[in-house]
From Swiss-Prot:
Protein name: Olfactory receptor 52A5
GO cellular component, as recorded: membrane; plasma membrane
Membrane topology term: Multi-pass membrane protein
Lineage, top ranks: Eukaryota, Metazoa, Chordata, Craniata, Vertebrata
Localization terms from the record: Cell membrane
Gene name of this polypeptide: OR52A5
GO BP terms, alphabetized: sensory perception of smell
Length: 316
């Protein structure tokens, strides 16, 4: 690996150290992380199977849930195998290109998940506020366009981050990344060159995706609450609100974890590094773990079909 004035020029590989300060207990940390991964994959796979084979669930609300489940599986799978390789098998090395590819996948799937949550909020808004137009607006073609749109938005907005790293950052102080996966700022901060453009673009993407989605999700639910509370019958209000509970829970835990991780990383300079890394890991691992549980508990149709799958023979 060529060096120049003490810096590394165009490194061929990086070293991921995992969770700095907790190297001695990483093998134990990997146990709950792997358990969350397995539960998340099984739970989300079960939701996908139920929605695929149950024709009554082939409606926008559950199609978006299937998109969310598939995204959760993909996001977790981008992170955990390599993380466990570091924690359990002492395999910290990752090639430069593989690291950038992992970074692109992780941030793209995060953006896709945010876009799906926005689509789910808009679906509930139309279903509750203008129900007579729901079937017309959320046609099969429109659902396909939404899926392609959130995917392309994520991929296109994240790609320039790779170009800025690959083409503009040539010299690195070290090849050791103090993280358990390849995260954008963790890589950028290793460079000796001016990284202001990278930082600005990173903030632009965060606000263009998360900021945009949060604003419109919030506006959707403000209008939903206004409409629900104007319903004359208490039973009708409860029924309408009940269709939103699971999505509200998923929305809150996804964005609260995201912003908590974001602000502690940028403004919590006095917080130990291992706290930052643990929060980043939890932000990515907890939503895919909790989402199928939340929807399994809070959504009657999903809950009934899970009971049918596991206890059908006993019931009959």
């Amino acid at each position: 690996m060529p060096t120049f004035n003490g810096s590394v020029f165009m490194p061929s590989a990086f070293i991921l150290i995992g969770i700095p300060g907790l190297e001695s207990v990483q093998c134990w940390i990997g146990i709950p992380f792997s358990a969350m991964y397995l539960i998340g994959v099984i739970g989300n796979s079960l939701i996908l199977v139920i929605i695929k084979y149950e024709n009554s669930l082939h409606i926008p609300m559950y199609i978006f849930l299937a998109m969310l489940a598939a995204t959760d599986i993909a996001l977790n799978t981008c992170i955990l195998p390599k993380m466990l390789g570091i924690f359990w098998f002492h395999l910290p090395e990752i090639s430069f290109d593989a690291c950038l590819f992992q970074m692109w996948l992780i941030h793209s799937f995060q953006a896709i998940e945010s876009g799906i949550l926005l689509a789910m909020a808009l679906d509930r808004y139309v279903a509750i506020c203008i129900p007579l137009r729901h079937a017309t607006i959320f046609s099969q073609q429109f659902l396909t366009h939404i899926g392609l749109g959130v995917t392309l938005r994520a991929a296109i907005l994240i790609i320039p981050s790779l170009g800025l790293i690959k083409c503009c950052l040539k010299h690195y102080r070290t090849t050791v990344i103090s993280h358990s996966y390849c995260e954008h700022m963790a890589i950028v901060k290793l460079a000796t060159e001016d990284i202001r453009v990278n930082k600005i673009y990173g903030l632009f993407v965060a606000f263009a995706i998360l900021g945009f989605d949060i604003i419109f999700i919030t506006l959707s639910y403000v209008q939903i609450f206004i409409t629900v509370f104007q319903l004359p019958q208490k039973e009708a209000r409860f029924k309408a609100f009940n269709t939103c509970i699971a999505h509200i829970c998923v929305f809150l835990q996804f964005y609260l974890l995201a912003f908590f991780s974001f602000f502690t990383h940028r403004f919590g300079s006095h917080i130990p590094p291992y706290i930052h890394i643990l929060l980043s890991n939890l932000y990515l691992l907890v939503p895919p773990f909790l989402n199928p549980i939340v929807y399994g508990v809070k959504t009657k149709q999903i809950r009934d079909h899970i009971v049918k799958v596991f206890f059908f023979k006993k019931v009959t």
